């Protein structure tokens, strides 16, 4: 199978296809997608999501039995089946691509290495996870994952935000817990469209995460999938062939989008009038990229170095963001339950050099306060909480704070653009001036010769004059030209 050859390996009834799929200009992934539905391809598995291949991409089975993806002589991905005596492969109707040995035993399968989607008959174990795309158009590994997390006596399915720094992650949603036994716990999606946790070799202890109440016929099946998406939510999709031929969301883990950790990077998420999430930066910081608010915010000035003996740091104050909660996770310095007042939570942060913010709230009629050493996982509107941010006294006011030109990368870029424009304008005007002088010199010589030949007086207005005009070429470039006129 090669990119140039455009070969596709179909399942028996044509439900799924295995082959190369284009993800951007001149970039392809080896993947599996639904082959019998109209519209854009819905990929359910990818081998090389983080390293797409070009037109030279080719899938080969080596003499050692290893299935590998090669591009321009370099191995991009391999199934690691060396020595397993691979004899054949099959694209199954379930969406699973499998490799068999001579005894028809499965030695490798795509179901055992999922990307962002779980299909019926596929099982998610504790050692596997689903990982989101990086954006709606970028298939590379994103910052969200769906996996089972362990408690002292149980397992539960959880959504996790993996901070871009890679230093820590935060679980912001979890399903019901299932107690551990001697058997492996699996998460699966059945053909009726229900999601459950169970023990792999037993029907006992079945625990539904979502149960579809619509009854299907005995042999009736629907196209369905569980997909974790770039916005941090995991959704159960069902293909509706009767009403517009489209994917319909039957269930979603997160019902309030702003409660998704990292939806605004380390910024604050608020819903607009249309209930769509909008990203804001806490006072004392600015957006890293206004066109990609999910990248989060950067501080306008560096945080104090508490290890230094230098006490020349600028004085700080606490700014209050009411009705705002901020995720803590590994950023929490300490928890306090003996805070006598809301303002006391801010005062604790102000007196702690390592604290950059603190959060106050009421839980079970008891006050809570936690201090933070960094802002990593983002915040959102919540009536029960108050967010305190430490800022320097000269930092400005509340709102979407923009850094001064000296510290904001975007401002530096604007200054560079202005400087470049001035250079281009100066060069163009200088060139035009030189051309005009050359034209005048040429014409003056011509007139002098005419005068010398005619021995007569001449009228000033009989001089040839020079004009410069601007012409735009067919390809949009601007070109200066000169011409003589009288």
Give, region by region, the residue ranges found by the protein language model.
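Beta-rich ligand-binding surfaces for carbohydrates and other polyanions
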Residues: 1-450
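Residues within well-formed alpha-helices
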Residues: 348, 475-476
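Cytoplasmic C-terminal tails of single-pass
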Residues: 450-475
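Protein kinase glycine-rich loop
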Residues: 482-486
């Amino acid at each position: 199978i090669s990119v140039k050859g455009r070969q596709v390996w179909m399942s028996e009834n044509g439900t799924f296809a295995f082959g190369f799929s284009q993800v951007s200009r001149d970039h392809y992934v080896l993947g599996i997608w639904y082959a019998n539905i109209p519209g854009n391809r819905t990929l359910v598995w990818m081998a090389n999501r983080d390293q797409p291949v070009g037109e030279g991409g080719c899938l080969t089975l080596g003499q050692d039995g290893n299935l590998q993806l090669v591009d321009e002589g370099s191995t991009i991905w391999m199934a690691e089946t060396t020595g397993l005596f691979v004899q054949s492969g099959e694209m199954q109707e379930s969406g699973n691509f499998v490799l068999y040995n001579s005894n028809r035993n499965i030695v490798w399968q795509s179901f055992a290495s999922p990307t962002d989607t779980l299909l019926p008959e596929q099982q998610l174990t504790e050692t596997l996870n689903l990982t989101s795309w990086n954006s709606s158009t970028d298939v590379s590994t994103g910052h969200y994952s769906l996996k089972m997390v362990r408690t002292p006596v149980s397992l539960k399915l959880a959504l996790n935000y993996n901070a871009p720094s890679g230093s820590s992650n935060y679980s912001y949603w979890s399903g019901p817990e299932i107690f551990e036994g001697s058997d492996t716990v699996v998460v699966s999606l059945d053909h009726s469209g229900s999601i459950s946790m169970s023990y792999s070799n037993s029907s006992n202890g079945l625990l539904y995460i979502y149960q579809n109440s619509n009854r299907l016929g005995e042999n009736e099946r629907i196209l369905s999938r569980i997909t974790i998406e770039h916005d941090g939510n995991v959704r159960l999709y069902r293909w509706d062939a009767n009403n517009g031929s489209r994917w319909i969301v039957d269930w979603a883990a997160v019902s309030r989008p702003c409660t998704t950790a990292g939806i605004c990077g380390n910024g604050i998420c608020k819903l607009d009038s249309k209930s769509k999430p909008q990203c804001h930066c806490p006072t004392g910081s600015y957006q890293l990229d206004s066109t990609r608010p999910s990248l989060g915010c950067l501080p306008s000035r560096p945080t104090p170095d508490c290890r230094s003996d230098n006490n020349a740091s600028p004085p700080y104050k606490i700014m209050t963001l009411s009705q705002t909660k901020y995720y803590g996770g590994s950023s929490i310095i300490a928890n306090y339950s003996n805070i006598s007042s809301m303002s006391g939570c801010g005062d604790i942060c102000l007196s702690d050099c390592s604290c950059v913010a603190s959060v106050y709230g009421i839980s079970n009629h008891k006050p809570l306060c936690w201090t933070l050493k960094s802002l990593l996982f983002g915040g959102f509107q919540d009536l029960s909480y108050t967010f305190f941010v430490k800022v320097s006294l000269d930092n400005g006011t509340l709102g979407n704070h923009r850094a001064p030109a000296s510290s904001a990368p975007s401002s530096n870029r604007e200054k560079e653009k202005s400087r470049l424009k001035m250079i281009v304008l100066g060069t163009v005007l200088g060139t035009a001036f030189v051309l005009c002088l050359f034209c005048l010199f040429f014409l003056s010589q011509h007139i002098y010769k005419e005068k010398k030949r005619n021995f007569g007086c001449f009228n000033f207005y009989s001089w040839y004059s020079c004009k410069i005009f601007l012409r735009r070429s067919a390809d949009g470039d601007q070109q200066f030209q000169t011409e003589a006129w009288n």
